[in-house]
Swiss-Prot record:
Belongs to the RITA family. It comes from Bos taurus. This is RBPJ-interacting and tubulin-associated protein 1. GO terms for molecular function: tubulin binding. It is found in: Cytoplasm; Nucleus; Cytoplasm, Cytoskeleton, Microtubule organizing center, Centrosome.
């Protein structure tokens, strides 16, 4: 009967034999890039990964780099099946030869901002374009004109902008004062004329908002006195402004059509 020590020694020997067999089997497997990066190279020699050149590299540099990469890969892996020359791509490299790949790459604005300025000899014309058409090419830096041109413009460029003449404002004031005076003569006691006066606030800036009706204002048939009342009351009729007094002098031109002439006293006398 074996002692526990002998049993332990024999178990260790069997485990060692199994480990030898498994390790010898794993050496024959071709190492992948995942196993090398995670667990290291089993044989101690790691093949050089393929280098990817940018498309604007010259053809001589790319062929030289491919040749050195192929020689190193063949030296590291003796069991490689590809026995082709150094110019051809090996089976280990994932890059394949593509006939549509750009060899002479013309740098764009993105390439200039990322990888430097543009080359001196690079042109913007295509190979199938004529020389006359290539001379017409220019960069697309276009901004719209500041003013519209042609018939779509609302105003020609030669005609200046017309400004509002002060005489037009005086005519509108005459018209507004005549209409408001006609309403006050008709005897409308509703606060509607006040609302009308408020709507013409641009022509009457000094009109205060009061609750009195125009019937409480002084006599509308005679000439108005632009001077304030002797009492200290700050109330002012909507029509007794300095501007309204000056306008009311020139307004009574309509009674002349009836034949009776009315002479008004100027406000400065």
């Amino acid at each position: 009967m074996k002692t526990p020590v002998e049993l332990a020694i024999s178990g260790m020997q069997t485990l060692h034999v199994q480990h030898r067999g498994r390790s010898g089997y794993r050496v024959k497997v071709r190492p992948s890039y995942v196993d090398e990066t995670l667990f290291g190279s089993p044989a101690g020699t790691r093949p050089v990964p393929p280098d990817f050149d940018p498309p604007w590299m010259k053809k001589a540099n790319r062929s030289r780099g491919v040749g050195t990469g192929v020689s190193q890969a063949l030296g590291a892996n003796g069991s490689c099946e590809s026995t082709s020359s150094s110019g051809s791509t090996p089976t280990l490299t994932p890059r394949k030869k593509n006939k549509y790949r750009l060899i002479s790459h013309t740098p764009s604005y993105c390439d200039e901002s990322l990888f430097g300025s543009r080359q001196e000899g690079a042109g913007w014309e295509a190979k199938w374009m004529a020389r006359g058409d290539a001379a017409k090419l220019h960069a697309l830096f276009w901004t719209p004109p500041a003013t519209p041109r042609g018939s779509h413009s609302p105003r020609p460029r030669e005609t200046p902008v017309r400004c509002v003449h002060p005489a037009d404002l005086s005519k509108t004031e005459h018209r507004v004062m005549a209409s408001s005076r006609r309403l006050s003569v008709d005897g409308l006691d509703t606060p509607r004329p006040l609302r009308r006066e408020r709507s013409h606030s641009l022509t009457h800036p000094n009109v205060p908002s009061t609750g009195h009706t125009p019937a409480s204002s002084p006599c509308t048939s005679g000439p108005r006195d632009p001077r304030p009342a002797p009492s200290g009351v700050t109330f002012r009729s909507p029509l007794v402004t300095p501007r309204a007094g000056s306008v009311s002098v020139s307004v009574p031109t309509t009674p002349r059509q009836g034949g009776a002439t009315q002479k008004t006293k100027p406000p400065w006398k």
